[in-house]
Amino acid sequence: MKASVLHKFRTPPNFEEVDDPVCRPKSVVVELKACGVCRSDHHAWLGNDPDVELPHIMGHELAGVIVEIGSEIKEFSVGDRVTVPFILGCGL
């Protein structure tokens, strides 16, 4: 899959191929349809967030469609349209 990857603070991120996510029993895989860039992305880009380690996949406000569900997921189905709240940082 493609991702916006920051390799060095205060430089443009690159769009790169990265490994597809692995769907664990308590997770879902979402095909991204839209992703916002916000102030916390700017802080990450500046190097002002001590939790950001490089390389860093940018963007965490997204909407998409579920393409795979884990074995323990009962509330969602493949094909559901979803938004993802900012609870965990990017690239996890």
Task: Report residues per predicted region.
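Residues located in well-ordered beta-strands
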Residues: 2, 14-17, 31, 65
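Cytochrome P450 core scaffold surrounding the K-helix E-X-X-R motif
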Residues: 40-46
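Short N-terminal binding/cap micro-motifs at the start of the first secondary-structure element
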Residues: 11-15, 39-40
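Residue-level signal for short segments within beta-strands and strand-turn junctions
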Residues: 5-7, 46, 66
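Glycine-rich beta-strand-centered segment in the early N-terminal region that forms part
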Residues: 21-35, 48-92
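Active-site donor-binding loop signature of nucleotide-sugar glycosyltransferases
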Residues: 8, 20
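A short beta-strand micro-motif
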Residues: 3-6, 82
